[in-house]
Amino acid sequence: MGLREGIPGTVFRADYQPPDFSVSHVALEVSIFDGLTEVVATLSLERNGPEGAPLKLDGEQLDLQWIELDGQRLAESGFELTANQLVIPNLPDRCVVRTCVQICPEENTSLEGFYRSQSAYCTQCEAEGFRKITYYPDRPDVLAIYTVTLEADRQTCPVLLSNGNLILEEEAAEGRHRATWHDPFPKPAHLFAMVAGDLKQVSDVFTTCSGKPVDLRIWVEEKDVNYCDYAMQSLKNAMLWDEQVYGLEYDLDLYNIVAVDDFNMGAMENKSLNVFNTSCVLAHPDITTDAGFQRVEGVVAHEYFHNYSGNRVTCRDWFQLTLKEGFTVFRDSEFSADINSRGVKRVEDVIFLRTHQFAEDAGPMAHPVRPDAFVDISNFYTLTVYEKGAEVVRMLHTLLGHKQFIEGASLYFRRFDGQAVTCDDFVDCMAEASGRDLAQFRRWYAQAGTPEVIANGHYDQAAEQYHLTLKQLNRPTPGQTDKAPLPIPVATGLLVDGKPIPLDSGTTRILELSEPEQTFTFDGVLARPVASLLRGFSAPVRLTIDQSESDLLTLMSGDDDDFVAWDAAQSLLARAIEALDLTGQESKIHSALREAIERVLVGPMDAAM
C-alpha cells in the first residue's frame, strides 16, 4: 500500500481528468470598501467534457449574492451551493456565467485569497487561493485571459494594480477611482494577483534585446523606498541573463513587484505582478549581510524566470509542481553562479541539499519529486520538489551538454506556450532535441530516496589503464520497497602527479551509471591517478569511496573542480579534528593540511572559494 492510500480525501495523480469546461476569458469587477469587498466575475465558458456534465466551480468563504446565465438571473432551484462548491446543471456548450459575491479581506487571516496586510490589500492564490475570491474552476489546467477592474477609495488606496497592462484609469463617485488591467496571456487562477493600497514606487526601465522599453516598478511603503535599488538591479540582471542564455525576452510593457511585511510566502510569481515579502526585496549595505544580498538577488531572479518556466508554460496539475519549481530553481542557481562565483554557489547549494533535503529523503515523509498522491497540496511545497527537482534538471543539463539542453528548453517553450503540461512533456522535449533515449531517466521523477554510489578504483600499470567500478544502492522508502537502477551521471576527473589530466571534455569525463554495477576504463594513464568523483556534484547522491589522506590532500590542493576540492578539504578537516580530539596534540595530518591550505591560497583557485 502506498504511503497515502486509504486516507480520506487523498488525490491521486493517476485519476487526473481534463476539466469539463474551459474558460476563455475572465472579467472581474472588484469594488473594495472598508470591511467588505464585492467581486463580480464574468466567465466565458466552453464545454470540454461529456454532454450533460454540470459546471462545478470552487469557492470558499464566499457570500453569494446572485448568479446569471447568459444574462438571465438564476433562481435558487437552478444551482446547488455547498460550503466549497457551486454546481450549475444543464448548461449549453457555450455560455457566459456571471456571479456576484461578497468577501471580507480584513477578516481573512489565512493570508490566502484576498486579504488586508498592514500596508495594502493583496492576494496569494497559489495553490488554491483564488476560490476565496470568487467561484471558479480553481485548477492549474484552466487557462484564461483576464480583464480586471478595481475600484476603491482614492485616499486609502491610491494605487490599484493587477496583472498585465494598465488600459484605463478613471474617477468614480464619492472620492473613489477605478483602474482596469488587461493581461493578454492566458494564465491559471493561481497566477492572478491584485493589490490596492497606499504604496510608493521605485522605477526604472529595461530595454529588451529587440529594443522594447519595459517599465520596471517596485512598490513598497514610503519608509522602504531607499532599500530597493539592489532588487531593481537584480531584476535587470535577470532579464538580461534570460535573453542571453535562453533567448527569452520579456513579453509585456510593464513589470511590477509589490513588497509587504506580512506576505506568507517568500515571493509569488503572479504574471507581471510579483508579490514579495519585504525580506526578499529590501537591501542596503547599512542593514544587509552578504547572505541577505544573495537572497534578494536569487529570489528576484527566481520569480522573474517563472515568467516562462511556470507562467507562459504552466503545470497541468499540482503533481507536476517540480516542472515549474525544479526547473526555475535550476535557472536561478545558474544565474547566481554566472553573476557571482560558480564554485561558491555550487558549494552553498550542496550544503543545503545535504543538510536538509537528504534528511527529508531519509525520513518517513520521503516522496518523489513528482508525487503520486496528496491530501493537501500545500504540504508538497517541499525541498524534494524544489531542490532535488532542480538537481534532476541539472542532471539533464549534464547528460545532454549545455547546447542540447538549451535546444530542448527552447523546444519546450515553443511547443507548449500557453499550455498546462507535465514533467513527461519536458523530458520529451529534451529527448527530441538531443536524440537520446531518456526513458530510464524518468525514474528520477518517480522514485524517492537518495541513492548511494560506492566507488572502487584499480590502476593497471602495465596496461596504463585505470579501472573504476561504480555500484549504486537504492534503498527502500515509505511506499517504495523495490527500486530500479537510476541513470546517474558521475562527472569524473583523474589527477596524476597532483594535476588533472586531459579527458573527454577538458579534464572531465561523464560516466553514466545506469546499471546496479558498472566498470569504466580510462586508457593512457601513465601513473596511478587520484580519482576526482562527482565533479560539480553532478548527481544528488551519497558517495562512498575509500580515500587516503594523501589522496584528499591532492584533491584539495590540485583539483580544478571547486566542489571536489572543497569536499576533500571538509573530509581532511574532519579527520584533523578527530585526530586532535584523540591525542590532544597535533599530528602529521595537521602539518600536511597547513601545507595544502598554503598551496590553495597561492594557486589558481577562484579567490571567492
What would you call each of these model-derived segments?
Residues 31, 48-50, 54-55, 59-117, ...:
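A surface-exposed beta-strand-loop module
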